[in-house]
């Protein structure tokens, strides 16, 4: 298993992958969490679908003064200079990351990504499903589901 990686999670405001409204980042070194970062982000396009608000609880008022992904990149870019990226349902998070980088005209070589959902299906047998909250319950990991930092932490710990 990987011992050094960055676990990520994004929450979006609507169906567009560039509509990031929250990011959670957890740095794992030698199998231990060494750093955590989370931030609200002003989504592009700037509108919220009620269905998405109901899922994560983030409202337009909460992000109206937040930085854009582009403006935040100067702070978060270093977290992506890592051996690997880990996420639960990594296909979603990686597509969001790539779309946001492209929209911001940022050309970044990303490391290999690993999906804890896919890994768990291979390694953990007998669960009713492989949703993040189910896995966290199984492993005794506290999770505030659909809060980006908590989801990144859960994905990082489920990787162990």
Q: Which role fits each region the language model picked out?
A:
Residues 1-110, 125-146:
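Conserved non-catalytic scaffold segment of RNase H-like nuclease domains
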Residues 72, 120, 155:
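Short Asp/Glu-rich motifs
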Residues 107-120:
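Conserved beta-strand -> loop -> alpha-helix junction used to position metal-binding or nucleic-acid-contacting
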Residues 148-160:
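Acidic, divalent-metal-coordinating active-site segment for phosphoryl/phosphodiester hydrolysis
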């Amino acid at each position: 298993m990987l011992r050094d990686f960055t676990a990520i999670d994004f929450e979006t405001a609507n169906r567009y992958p560039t509509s990031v409204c929250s990011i959670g980042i957890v740095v794992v070194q030698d199998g231990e969490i060494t750093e955590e970062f989370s931030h609200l982000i002003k989504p592009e396009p700037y509108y919220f679908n009620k269905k998405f608000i109901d899922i994560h609880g983030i409202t337009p008022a909460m992000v109206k003064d937040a930085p854009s992904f582009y403006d935040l990149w100067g702070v978060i870019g270093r977290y992506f200079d890592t051996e690997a990226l880990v996420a639960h349902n990594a296909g979603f998070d990686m597509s969001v990351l790539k779309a946001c980088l492209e929209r911001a005209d940022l050309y970044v070589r990303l490391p290999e990504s690993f999906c804890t959902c896919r890994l768990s299906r291979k390694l953990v047998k007998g669960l009713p499903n492989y949703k993040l909250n189910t896995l966290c319950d199984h492993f005794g990991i506290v999770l505030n589901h659909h809060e980006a930092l908590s989801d990144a932490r859960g994905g990082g710990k489920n990787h162990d």
